[in-house]
Swiss-Prot record:
This is Threonine--tRNA ligase. Not inhibited by 1 uM borrelidin (BN); probably does not bind BN. Its cofactor is Zn(2+). It comes from Methanocaldococcus jannaschii (strain ATCC 43067 / DSM 2661 / JAL-1 / JCM 10045 / NBRC 100440) (Methanococcus jannaschii). Changing residue 80 to A: Still charges Thr, no longer edits mishcarged L-seryl-tRNA(Thr), high mischarging activity. It catalyses: tRNA(Thr) + L-threonine + ATP = L-threonyl-tRNA(Thr) + AMP + diphosphate + H(+). Catalyzes the attachment of threonine to tRNA(Thr) in a two-step reaction: L-threonine is first activated by ATP to form Thr-AMP and then transferred to the acceptor end of tRNA(Thr). Also activates L-serine, but does not detectably transfer it to tRNA(Thr). Edits incorrectly charged L-seryl-tRNA(Thr) via its editing domain. Has no activity on correctly acylated L-seryl-tRNA(Ser) or L-threonyl-tRNA(Thr).
Amino acid sequence: MKMLLIHSDYLEFEAKEKTKIAEETENLKGKLDECLACFIAVEREDENNPEGTAIGAVEEIEKVANQLKVNNIVVYPYAHLSSDLSSPETAVKVLKDIESILKERGYNVLRAPFGWYKAFKISCKGHPLSELSRKIVAKEEKKEEGEESKFYLLNPETEEIIELNENNINIIKDEELLALAKHELGIREHKEHDEPPHVKFIKEKDICSYEEASDPGHFRWYPKGKLMRDLLADYVYNLVVNMGAMPVETPIMYDLGNPAIREHADKFGERQYRFRQGNKELMLRFAACFGQFMMKKDMYLLPRYLPLKLYELSTYSFRYEQRGELVGLKRLRCFTMPDMHTVCLNLEQAMEEFEKQFWECLKTGDDLNLSYSVIFRFTKDFFDEHRDWFFKIAKEYKNKYGKDVILEILPKRKHYWVGKVDIAVIDSLGRPIENPTVQIDVESAKRFDIKVHTNEGEIYPIILHCSPTGSIERVLCGLLEKAAIEAEKGNAPMLPVWLSPIQVRVIPVAERHYDYALKVAEKLRENNIRADFDDREESVSKKIRNAGKEWVPYVVVIGDEEMESDKLTVTIREKSTLKKPYKEKMTLDELIERIKKETANYPYRPLPLPIRCSLQPKFH
C-alpha cells in the first residue's frame, strides 16, 4: 500500500461520474475541516493479507494524527500512487476496514467513494510535517495461543485411548502405523531426507519426468505414464458412479472477487497460484470444491435428492508447494485429484455417509493391493458427543483388517470440518503418503449459500468431501514405493497387472520364430491384453533383461519347442524373485484366461504403442 498524508485546513470532494468498478454509495460529496487527508492506493501484494494491511495503515495514520493532534481523518482512494494495484474488491475491503477501525478508535472519519471520477479541493497547511508519504506492509495478526492437538492410540475392544508422545510411541507394534504416528508427532528419522525410490522409477520406466520449460513441480507424461494415469482415473470413475455419484466438470480458475471463493481459498493459506487478468484477480483451483459448490448453490435442492453426490476428476489441480519441498509424485505443483462432494440433510445423514465412504476408501487399498494406515481427526466437542459411533467404526475396522488406528483430538474447530479420516501408504523410507480422505464440512454450505428447501423452510446442509484414492499421482507414488519395498525383500518389483502398460512381452529366440511370435502378440491384443513383440536386434538374454527392467508381468519366449508343442514358456513376475525367475508352461489360451481372470472388474485401455518394440520411440 502507498499513502500520501496531507495535513489540511480542509478537504472537499464531489463524485461526478462512475467508472466500471465504482462502489455503490449515496455518499457522493463531503467536506471535512482541520483534517488529515489520507490518499491511499491499495496494491497487489496487499491481497495476501488485506486485514493486516488495513491494521498497518491505521497504525501509521494514528501515529501522524497524534503528532499533529488531529481527530478528523479523510480516507481518499487514489490509484495514481501505484502502477501495481490490487483488485477493486480488495481495495474496497481494505478502505472500508481502515474507516471502520479508525471510527472504533474514536476518530471522525470521512471516506470518499471508490471507483468514481471525483472533483476535490484541498488546502495544505504547509508546515514541515504537512506532506508525508508512507509504504505500508501488512501487519501480521497475532496468532491465538491455545491448546494443541493431542494424538492417541486406541484399543477399539476396550475403548481405551492412550495419549501418544515421544517417550511412549513405541507401544505401537505395527511398523506402518508407528511411522504415521511419528510423522504426526513431528519425530523425524534421518532417512526421511533421502530421495524416495519412485523418483528414479518414474524416469526409468518411461512414466513421466519434470518439464524444465514449465514451473518446477510440473510433469510431462509419456505414453505409458499417461495410460496408467487414465486407467486409475477410469477405476475411480467406476467406483464413484457405483456409489451413486454424478460426474460433472467445472473450470480450473476462479475469481477471487467472489467473497465465498476468496474466503474458501484463504482457508488454505498462501500455497496457491494467483494471477491478474485485467482488473480481476484469479486463482487456479487446488480441488474441485469451488466449482461444485457454485453449482450446488444454483440447484434447487430438496430432501428427497439427498444424499446428493457430485464427482469430478479435477484435472488439473494446482498447489504452490515450496520448491525445496517438491518430491517426485508425492509433492508436486500440478496434480490430478478425484473429488466427490456429498450434500447431506443433517449431521445424522452425514455420519452415515461418512461411514460408507470410509469403507469405500479402504476398498481402494484392497483393489490396488496397498497397505493403508488410518488416522481419524475430530474436534473435542464432536468426539465427546459421538464417541460410541467412532468406536463402532474403529472396532469394525480392527475386526476386518487387524489394525489399530490413531486418533487426533483438536481442542476446537479451526478448519471447515469437525471430523475427518486420512488414510496413508507408508513409503520405503518410512514416510506417509496421505491418499484417501473423507471430511465432514459444517461451514461451506453457509459460505456458498447452498440451501435445502424443506417443509419447515430453508436449511444449510452438511457437505462431505471425499477423495476415494487421493491424487492419481500419489496413488502411483504409493504403488512404486510398494514395489521398492518388495525389491528390498528380494522379490521382483511390479505393478498390478491391470495397471501395467505392457502386460505381456513376446520374445522370439531367432528370426525364424518372428512370424509365430508376432501372431501370439496379435492374438493377445485381440483379447484386450496389452502385448508387444520384441523384434530388436539384440540377444535373447538382453531382451529378457529389458523386459525385467520394465517390470513386464508376463514374458513369453518363443523357440522351436514352443512352436512345435503350442506350449509357451512363460516367466511370471509375481512368483519370481530378483535372483530366480519363475517359469511355467502353458498354452496361449491358458495365458489369456489367466490374465483375464487377474484383470476382471478392472478398467482396460489398449496399449498406445506399436506392437513391434523396434518401432517404439525413446522419450529421453
